[in-house]
């Protein structure tokens, strides 16, 4: 096999490859609608919005009111932003870069 991945690691890699193969927003909607429950999709969207707000310097109280998410979840997201692998920050910066192309000129 040569890749060094076994069992669940290979399964996870294959799922990430499936996500990376999606080319349009419609494909994403269709894939995630089949893969996840409405609640799971909503939870992911809330976490991403909370991460954006944390990166923008918003307080926990502001985030709770705007996103209707628990302070425990906000705290976990904040720990990921501060000490994690950088996934939230990198993804949010990429999305913001595509939404505001003038900033890159």
What are these regions (language model features)?
Residues 15-22:
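Short, charge-rich, low-complexity alpha-helical interaction segments
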Residues 26-46:
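Short, Lys/Arg-enriched anionic-surface-contact patches
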Residues 44-58:
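Short, amphipathic alpha-helical "recognition" segments used to contact nucleic acids or chromatin
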Residues 57-64, 86:
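Short helix-capping/linker segments at secondary-structure and domain boundaries
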Residues 62-67, 74:
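Short alpha-helical "recognition helix" segments of helix-turn-helix
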